[in-house]
Amino acid sequence: SGPAPLAPPRGVPAMAAPRALLAAAVLLSPLLSPLLSAGAAGAAPAPAPRNVSVLLEPGSGRLRVLPGRLPAAVAWASLDDRIPHVGWAFLEVTTNASYNDSLQAYAAGLAEAAVTEQLMYMHWMNTMVGYCGPFKYESEYCQKLRDYLEANLGWMEEQMGKGQDPEYWHQVRLALLQLKGLEDSYNRRLDFPRGRFTLAPFGFLLLQLGGDLEDLESALNRSSLQRVLGSGSCSALVKLLPGNRDLLVAHDTWNSYQSMLRLIKKYTLPFRASAGKSQIPGSIQVFSSYPGTIFSADDFYILSSGLVTLETTIGNNNPARWKYLDPRGSVLEWLRNIVANRLARSGPEWATVFRRFNSGTGLVVEADLTELLYQQGYWASYNVPYFEEIFNASGNLELVRKYGDWFTYDKNPRAQIFRRNQTLVHDLDSMIRLMRSNNYLQDPLSRCRGCDPPQNAENAISARSDLNPPNGTYPFPALRQRCHGGTDMKVTSSGMVPSFGLVAASGPTWDDVPPFRWSTSPCSSLLHMGHPDLWTFPPVKVHWD
């Protein structure tokens, strides 16, 4: 059968414009004035934020979702949908520490879906509809995937019931309960699970699986893979300003353009580390995300523990490692990510939590690179492993032998652009310019050996693969014309982190290249419900009341 979330929310026509769906004030910072020349002129006024509360009925013990912010609620959610104006919607979800953790987690999911259900529906239609649904002829792969996910969920359920390692499994259970609440709320089925519970393998769980799914498709022999050889999946930069004035941390997501219904979320979930224990260090999290997704998936987080965590994908290109995949004994990456963000108080602690129960192919090497940051002034990440052990184990040597320097850590185009241009970063403004940069027609470092034409829009800090000609010659698929590229930019600093502040820009870069417009792009036939047509959004400074 097809995935549960195929039906639109009740009372919502399938192609409805997003309904007025946060108490986050989005202010255009004067600091960013050079980048704000193209505001949303002529756009309709933004709708008022939408608020809901989840209440526990004292007599029946049932949960109800009601409009407004009611003081005795288990959870509250508030959504300010500014996608037509700035390319982002802003969501706050807060739970009440006077209730038990399980109730809080489930209610958090209920509240989030209640205010974002239209965005969830449109994002599902744009990105997941038909995945292992009734009309796709991938029945053998889909059955293998269903079996894998069901076995994995079953194994985790066993671990939660054993009572061993309660801190870890408590957080896993809370994350799954939150997802269950999200799904139940969307399907108008509010029923708090008091014991064991199940998740539909092809329901909203699929929206959590992004990076895991890329690997599972290869391992389970899906014939049409999502992952494209050489395809990057993010650029990140840690930059120490001259004189150690400030530390800036920035991240660009690279993704399919169909994924551009975007949220910035603030979760305040005062869970306990385990029964009767103190509150978790990462109870407050601000992160860039997507409808129906309870973690970042980009990933970029600012945490109440004082940590900022981010990643760029390192894919596995070594088929010999797939034999290590086992649904029993592993926790998928999205969950390990959530648990590490909640429990860790430091970088080493984060790595220790994250490496446990890795998905089989996982190889974690941890190191403190502070000295290197002091020496070279920056640290960049661009989908190529830094550590030799990971580089070799994931099959990169073979790619270097076959395709050359593009697959190396130090001579990859982005490695060279970061090395050259990071010296130009002296404040927030110049950091944003670097992270949004794509001057592929003029930049000699964007040239591609073996490509015709030689200048390639993939070879930049923020890719614009839609600009590559459809009839060019390219040595491997990532360099072709694709509806894929840098889809955002987020940056924070040591000064902004205590108040969970950040600056964020949504959509493909348009600093040195033509802006992306769905109606005139080679991607116009792809489903993009709820998206603005023209993507010319300035960076916005995000404050929280």
Specify the residue positions occupied by each region the protein language model found:
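C-terminus-biased signal that marks the final domain/tail of proteins
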Residues: 16-21, 34-247, 256-261, 269-295, ...
